Amino acid sequence: MRKIILVTTTNCPRCGYIRRTVFEPVKEKCPEQCYTVNGSAAPEFVKRYDIKGAPSILFLEDDERAGIAYKTFEVDNIIKWLKGEKYHD
């Protein structure tokens, strides 16, 4: 069985610095010190289909290969994937 880990990415609107959050709320400043980014990617987001911020990365843990296979999806595609609907790459 594959384990789903959702990682949301947000970037500074001024300098474009990208940060990722996984499960825990994180407070972080971009290197340019021009924007403070707050947020978290909790499992509840997946259950409620309440996914904010794009793009997002869905990590699928592949037990057979003992590695991590990942694919980048737009937020709408993640929701479609979770519902079992067709999506665009």
Where are these regions (language model features)?
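Local sequence-structure signature of Cys/Sec-based thiol-disulfide redox active-site neighborhoods
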Residues: 1-28
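Hydrophobic beta-strand residues in large extracellular and virion-surface proteins
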Residues: 4-7, 55-57, 78
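Thiol-based oxidoreductase modules, predominantly thioredoxin-like and allied folds used
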Residues: 6-9, 30-44
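Short alpha-helical
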Residues: 13-14, 41, 73
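Short, glycine/charged-enriched secondary-structure capping and boundary segments
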Residues: 19-22, 49-51, 72-73
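Short amphipathic alpha-helix with an adjacent loop that forms part of the alpha/beta core around
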Residues: 45-49, 82
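Structural micro-motif
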Residues: 49-60
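Non-catalytic, surface beta->alpha helical segment in thiol-disulfide oxidoreductase systems
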Residues: 59-89
